[in-house]
């Protein structure tokens, strides 16, 4: 008999999920969207003897890279940096014209995190005293991260805040790609001894 299930969940900044009031103070939630989808499937290959199971899950999350805007920005906003919009545009244009470097946006952009993983497992009841399990796990993920806040000489600060703004392409991507395979034998050697 094959058994399985499919699932999907979603969260975003909709008022269904996120409030707009904190102890009497109105708050505006940043835009985000998260989708989780997956399925599982399991079945005996040989009744009461050999079984197989698998599952898959993927997660996609988009969230603001920054909620700050520059002074003079057409976007406006509640968190305004003292850095001028015109200066950021001029710097981006200079970097492209002089070096061919695309800085990316400096406000109003999103970061994306994506993850995909699956597992395959088999269980073999060899006999009353021995059970063998084999499993394989595969996980791939990418997460866009804003520029590091590590301070340089002179106590510089590179992250977007009141005194500074950074471009999206100043950030980096963390990749977490993992593969794992396990073969496990559980044996009952005697009533008091197991491996």
Where are these regions (language model features)?
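Acidic, glycine-rich flexible loop segments
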Residues: 1-177, 191
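Short, intrinsically disordered, charge-balanced linker/junction segments flanking boundaries
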Residues: 187-195
């Amino acid at each position: 008999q094959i058994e399985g299930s499919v699932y999907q969940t979603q969260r975003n900044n909709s008022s269904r999920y996120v409030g707009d009031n904190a102890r009497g103070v109105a708050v505006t939630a940043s835009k985000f969207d998260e989708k989780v989808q997956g399925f599982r499937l399991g079945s005996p290959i040989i009744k009461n003897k050999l079984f197989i199971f698998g599952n898959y899950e993927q997660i996609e999350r988009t969230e603001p890279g920054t909620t700050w805007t520059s002074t003079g920005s057409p976007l406006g906003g509640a968190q305004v940096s003292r850095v001028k919009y015109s200066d950021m545009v001029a710097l981006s244009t200079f970097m492209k014209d002089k070096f061919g470097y695309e800085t990316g946006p400096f406000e109003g952009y999103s970061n994306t995190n994506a993850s995909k993983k699956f597992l395959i497992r088999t269980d073999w009841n060899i006999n009353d005293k021995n059970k063998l399990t084999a499993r394989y796990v595969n996980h791939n993920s990418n997460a866009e991260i804003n520029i590091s806040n590590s301070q340089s000489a002179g106590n510089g600060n590179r992250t977007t805040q009141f005194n500074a703004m950074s471009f999206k392409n100043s950030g980096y991507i963390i990749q977490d790609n993992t593969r794992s395979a396990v073969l496990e034998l559980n044996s009952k050697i005697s009533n008091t001894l197991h491996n």
